[in-house]
Amino acid sequence: MAQQKKPTALAVMNDFQIVSRYDGMTPEDLEELKDQLEDLDQDTGIACRSIKIPSGGGTAYEVQGEDDDTDPMKTITGVVVFTHRLSGYWPNAYGSSNNPEDKLPTCASMDGKTGIVQKGDNTGEVITCKTCPWNQYGTARDQAGNQARGKACKNMRRLYILMDGDPNLYLLTVPPTSIKDVNNQLAKIAPYADKVVTLSLEKATNAGGTPYSKVVVKRTGVLPPAAAAVVSELHRQIKAQYQNMALTMDDYTAAPERGKAVDVTPDDAEWEAMNGGGDFQEAPPHAPQGPAL
């Protein structure tokens, strides 16, 4: 009789640093900074930098740095503080319009369950995603306008990530072609907010010979209790605000090569890879770590 393989215990990563840009500031300095920020009338919502997936099957993430420049990173090691699914329906193909308003979806859902029409005569109408005709397979259109096997409404997932020793919060939007794999990987590490993970990209090729990038999430270690408690509190704060983060076409599209539009409609091979049974998969809910705050 074959012996069952015992799960490998994850090492506690005591060297992983959860830092704040305000560490070391006196109460007086913090109060002065608060006054300065309020005077700048900053936008409400969650302040975070972007992580983009490259086009053309690239294997390095494009991570937003200082002054909006980007730094290529083959791997990203950090903590998934919060994650949620979201969906957006754009009737036009990417790059088919120069109107900035067309970046906004006609309908958007911040939980993948209930959508709200964003523009047009039916603005404000509430839509049930499961039964919406645009959220069914076979309703997608490719760049040429031909029917494709995917969904017209694009199912995605947002990951809010903290990196080691970095005070900035980062946002990665997982595209439809990586949804199934990422959901399965998150399920293996749940509850996820006390786990350190490493994200990478694998090059894949669709049936038409076009390369694309797939998101890979692997377990790396476990946070010590004190750091896990800090992440749990940050999770609570993001959960209270995440629905204020607008969904735009930038969430759905890859970082393009210069001068090239990106075909973001999954082809048959990609559709088969992400269609595990027809239903959108949800990762397990977050279980708070450390003491209740």
List PLM regions with ranges.
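Glycine- and charge-rich intrinsically disordered segments
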Residues: 1-56, 224-293
